[in-house]
């Protein structure tokens, strides 16, 4: 290899290249779950069944809807936006990092097969080309009270639901729902949704994207709950109404504050060293 070619290879930003590869693969994997958004209304005759523990797929419509919303919309689209502008959306990589940690704590003890997904997410985080930004939680703007208030309200409403599902999973209540670890899966996805909402309220770089995705996810789950009020794990009609209204309010508040911030200078990010 000539000296010029060697110099060119050395000048490549290998960390950025690896990040693009890992993040692209994982984003594609997460986005393939978007088909699950059709679960509340889809015919089970053509709907894909990829878990042999689900003896009656019709029972799992709500779990599938929540899986598609949080994994496909919230996580998948967040990672896609991060691929587009990794330096300008540091809050999104922090969300991915915390989601990977949360999955390891919440779900891995029940579902060891999830280790592969957690490792892939960890590789995305480790390859992030601006590592100092990962541990920088400072912000140039104060926490957005409206988003924080909506996040707290959602957490208070979902906490009894989360505690109940954890109890059911540990005690193997609910037949194939427990056998397929669907209760703890719903806990994981509910927790990640709340995480996205709380992080969006910090107004760190990327908060507009995370706030919008969190609002869309919450609104969709409200519609899904209204369509599946009596299904196992569903938030029911009342919960669906609250989720739909809350999601719309979250998106509206995000959009309103984003308009106010559009002319404000962005905080310079730490160097990648």
Predicted segments with their positions:
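Membrane-interface capping segments at transmembrane-helix boundaries
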Residues: 2-6, 10-11, 132-136, 252-269
